[in-house]
Amino acid sequence: MMGEFIIYYRGKVVGGIYDGFASLLNHPKSLVRNRVIYILAANAQWDDENRFDAILNDYLAHVIDEKPITARQCIKALAQVGKAKTQYIPRIIDYLHSADLSKYKDSMRPLIEQDIAETEKALTLYEKANS
């Protein structure tokens, strides 16, 4: 059906309305955003219609989420998105390079920087493997 596809979580169908689910990326509670980020990344591999294209900008915005834990979850999940959608890798890497991390406390910034480095490394490997 147009505008729908199945959302799987831990091997079980948990939803079918992609647009409504993706709108939760902007939920006020960070726990909800964390789960949506994780589930969307896990389901990117089944996105044959490239519907992730429509949400990529909103998804990438969470690289600098107001909550550092959500930012870290997003950055780590981007490796899974890039593996499933290799056409996004250059854009993801560019976004990670340009991310302004100055708003995060000194205690969190190094962790986020490490996550970015690990994700970039994984994405670069996926890109080389698919060239």
PLM feature spans:
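Alpha-helical scaffold domains
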Residues: 1-131
